[in-house]
């Protein structure tokens, strides 16, 4: 038995030795195969390079490798592209860009370049044009090929070696552009968007393969894409969350600048910088950058931009006006900012700027701002004089008459005189009335209420509400409820205070007002519920206990009612004592 076990052990050892020898041999063979494969690839590349015509060999120097990413940094794909302009303009396939948030770019040598902006896209022909910032740009000239001619598909080195092919059919689309059906052995869909060149090294199109169908679409079609002002809202380009370039035309660029506000904040900022770089003599870019800086709380940068605008803009009046207007809006609370305004921003500074604007180019709008600033300085007589002079000019603005009425009110004019100006402001509004006329109906409505003409006031306030449907806050409905109470319009008042409660459910005073009004219209149960809600929101709110107590006494809960009224008295409510005396 022992001898048998020893023999078996020897047999196992011999088998393991043979297996080890076989394994080592296989490893050597695999290593040799990998080496041969690598050598084969290098030889293939070398042989392909030697097989290419001289003009084709240099095409690779014009290629780019694009890597597209989503917002979270996930890589979407790797795409070939090619330069067609010395200013960094390139073309590629469009589909890989859809859903993309950023693009990494490398040139033929592997050096990183910066993606700048989209210059056009077509999802039907699957082409896009864009710009990159590169240290060295070698654009290809565009050319053509005829049926039967030899062509080459040339991707970046990172995506493979050039592949020779042939034009099967040369056709046209959109009248003047070429479309080629190709036969390219060894090509695949990973080369979609790669350059297809003729034997002169001219770019005839971009390669596409779908199934077994191979083709090239004329790069001239993408070259001729033109961005306009409305391109910022182009539904195809907006499928990629990438910046869209500015047009070359000033007028179109101004439109694009306004629409670029809907892009990502970083892209919007880049568009503003591009605008300032392209059109340093226009005020629009500096003003846009000012508002962007104010939104970020960089108030010093906002001031610097306004100063830069004054220094660089060709229309000095516009630049000074913008400076004055921004200061005025900020100091009067019409433009919110983070932090404190620059120390130099005063109403005197604003007035000086707008006076310089008017001196450079007298305009109604400049004089109007001048009057508004003087009013904000509480110089009401001087402001009124200027507003009156503006009222004699064209265009006749309802705002001017409203501001005259405000001056008169500050100077102590009688109600009839103020009302006459407010009626004039409504009279000069465009008809049929639109939302722009709402402020003038509102101001006249408040003046009617001040004069005790509550029903006329209600008509104007209803118009104001109509023009602002869905945009009014609880404070408006509370204000109108107070006017309705004075006019003894209790049902309308109740509806408005309940609307205020719905819009501001945590505002205890609105619920207390609702409870008080319920008592006035003899609805004690509803009054009690409103009061309980007040106490729930704020247990230390004395009016809530007073209203609850009064409601309870009317609901035959006298003991509880008196207890709550006494609690309101103890909490400092001055009305509680008079109610207690009546009850006792």
PLM region spans:
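Flexible, gly/ser-rich surface segments that form the specificity/activation loops bordering the active-site cleft
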Residues: 52-57, 136-181, 186-192, 207-217, ...
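A conserved glycine-rich beta-strand in the N-terminal activation segment of trypsin-fold
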Residues: 52, 69-93, 112-114, 192-194
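Register position in tetratricopeptide repeats
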Residues: 295, 329-330, 376, 410-411, ...
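Short, small-residue-biased leader/transition segments that mark boundaries at the very start
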Residues: 1-3
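Canonical tetratricopeptide repeat
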Residues: 288, 322, 369, 403, ...
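C-terminal cap/linker of serine protease catalytic domains
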Residues: 53-56, 205-267, 271
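Catalytic-histidine neighborhood of serine endopeptidases
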Residues: 85-126
